[in-house]
Amino acid sequence: MADRVRARIVVSGRVQGVAFRQSAADEGRRLGVKGWVRNLPDGRVEAEVEGERAAVGALVRWCHAGPPAARVDGVEVEWVDPAGDLGAFEIRF
């Protein structure tokens, strides 16, 4: 069994109104991770993802750049114990 990890990610900068959520969901699905992404009221984007260590790490690295129209100023990552309760990667509203 692959080494599974879970991360809570908060991205700040110009990350709303630039297709960040859709792009993150597409990237998460491409990488085969489970989880979700949503906008926060304060202008940041939050995601919670779980999967193989390499895939989750790749998504965290992707968040540092985001889609072309985004300007990422910061990425906060909190590593938590995997729970196995996340479904297919989705956008939450």
Swiss-Prot record:
InterPro entries, per the entry:
Acylphosphatase (IPR020456), Acylphosphatase-like_dom (IPR001792), Acylphosphatase-like_dom_sf (IPR036046), Acylphosphatase_CS (IPR017968)
What is this enzyme's EC? Answer: 3.6.1.7
**Superkingdom assignment:** Bacteria
| Known catalytic reactions | an acyl phosphate + H2O = a carboxylate + phosphate + H(+)
A molecular function GO annotation: acylphosphatase activity
Instruction: Give the family this protein belongs to, as stated in its UniProt record.
Output: Belongs to the acylphosphatase family.
What Gene3D superfamilies does the annotation carry? 3.30.70.100
Q: Where is the active site?
A: R21, N39
**What name does this protein carry?**
Acylphosphatase
Pfam families the record matches: Acylphosphatase (PF00708)
UniProt keyword terms in alphabetical order:
Hydrolase
Q: Which organism's genome codes for this protein?
A: Anaeromyxobacter dehalogenans (strain 2CP-C)
Acylphosphatase-like domain boundaries:
6-93
Tell me the NCBIfam families matching this sequence. Answer: PRK14441.1 (NF011013), PRK14444.1 (NF011016)
Designated gene of the protein: acyP
